[in-house]
C-alpha cells in the first residue's frame, strides 16, 4: 500500500487572510491524531492563493477522514473566493505517492 496525498487549492477573499489563518489553525489542530494522517501543510502560492497539502498513510485513511475534512471546509468556505463556477471555492486533487526522495 502506498502513501496518499491530497492538495486543495483555494483563494482567500481580500482582507480575510488573518481570519482564514486562524480558522485553518483550528482545523489543523482538530485533524491532529486523525488515523492515518502523517502531516498537513499550508503553502502560499500567490498573494491570496494557498494550497493545503495532506500526507496520508494510505487511500483508506483519507477516505475515512473525508467527512471531517468537509466539515473543516465548512468553517472557512465564507472566507474563500470562487475559483470558477465549475469548481466553486476549492480545487481539490488527490492520488497515490508514486515517487518519494527520503
Pin down the residues of each PLM region.
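Short, surface-exposed ligand-recognition loops at beta-strand->loop->(often short) alpha-helix junctions
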Residues: 11-22
Amino acid at each position: 500500500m502506498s502513501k496518499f496525498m491530497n492538495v486543495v487549492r483555494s483563494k482567500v477573499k481580500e482582507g480575510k487572510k488573518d481570519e482564514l489563518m486562524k480558522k485553518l489553525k483550528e482545523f489543523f489542530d482538530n485533524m491532529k491524531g486523525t488515523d492515518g494522517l502523517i502531516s498537513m501543510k499550508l503553502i502560499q502560492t500567490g498573494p491570496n492563493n494557498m494550497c493545503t497539502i495532506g500526507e496520508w498513510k494510505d487511500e483508506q485513511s483519507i477516505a475515512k477522514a473525508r467527512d471531517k475534512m468537509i466539515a473543516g471546509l465548512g468553517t472557512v468556505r465564507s472566507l474563500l473566493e470562487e475559483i470558477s463556477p465549475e469548481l466553486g471555492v476549492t480545487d481539490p486533487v488527490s492520488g497515490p505517492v508514486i515517487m518519494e526522495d527520503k
